[in-house]
């Protein structure tokens, strides 16, 4: 499956592209991946597996042990550091400062930088196998950057009110600057992947049409549609 994807991706010539990416500055690799995905639409379904940043090969290995094959889509999460007395309540999303969920789920004593750099190296290895890479980001509310109680992410009915959302999206406000500073913490790792010519299906703020995260279900001009 992985070799098939690598072969098809390699066969997408730039002068045959029919699909224009939203970002006109998208790399050639990103354009090839987009064209590949459109080329198999309605004909193939790609298997994928999410892996937690604290143990990025664990669940992929489980799939291989059960099937003898690796999913062609390999995913992970830039994640957050869970704080407080109820960190295990959020183990299902794999906070990066804890060992893999569904086990002991104990502090792993690794820094944010160490874990995210390890994620980059894992991605490079998986991409070399011909895998398609997708990354998400369970991120804290921007004022807390990368360290928060999970309830800062899973806010449910306590999602930010309109005034807070307007401050977040208004250029130059304190919260807007905190948001940009938070996003800047993952840029060095994304740049490494760009420089390694690895296209990423990048989907921060995922499930934005749900009702559980702080960024969910926001109508209006600056909505998460």
Listing of model-derived features with the role each one plays in the protein:
Residues 49-52, 75-82, 137-141, 206-208:
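Short, flexible loop/turn elements at secondary-structure junctions
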Residues 15-79, 89-105:
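N-terminal module-boundary/linker segments of secreted carbohydrate-active enzymes
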Residues 86, 90, 95-225:
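Substrate-binding cleft of extracellular glycoside hydrolase catalytic domains
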Residues 10-11:
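C-terminal motif of bacterial Sec signal peptides marking the signal peptidase cleavage site
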Residues 1-2:
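N-terminal export leaders
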């Amino acid at each position: 499956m992985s070799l098939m994807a690598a072969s098809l991706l390699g066969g997408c010539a730039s002068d045959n592209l029919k699909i224009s990416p939203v970002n006109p500055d998208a790399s050639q690799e990103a354009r090839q991946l987009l064209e590949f995905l459109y080329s198999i639409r309605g004909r193939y379904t790609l298997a994928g597996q999410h892996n937690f940043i604290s143990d990025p090969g664990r669940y992929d290995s489980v799939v291989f042990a059960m099937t003898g094959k690796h999913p062609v889509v390999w995913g992970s999460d830039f994640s957050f550091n869970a704080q407080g007395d109820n960190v295990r309540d959020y183990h299902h999303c794999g906070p990066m400062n804890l060992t893999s969920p569904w086990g002991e789920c104990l502090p792993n004593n690794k820094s944010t930088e160490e874990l995210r750099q390890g994620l980059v190296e894992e991605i490079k290895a998986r991409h070399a196998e011909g895998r398609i890479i997708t990354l998400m980001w369970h991120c804290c509310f921007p004022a807390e950057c990368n360290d928060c109680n999970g309830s800062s992410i899973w806010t449910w009915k306590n999602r930010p009110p309109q005034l807070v959302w307007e401050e977040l999206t208004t250029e130059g406000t304190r919260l807007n600057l905190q948001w940009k500073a938070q996003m800047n913490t993952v840029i060095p790792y994304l740049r490494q992947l760009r420089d390694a010519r690895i296209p990423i299906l990048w989907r921060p703020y995922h499930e934005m049409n749900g009702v559980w995260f702080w960024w969910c279900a926001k109508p209006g001009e600056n909505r998460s549609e």
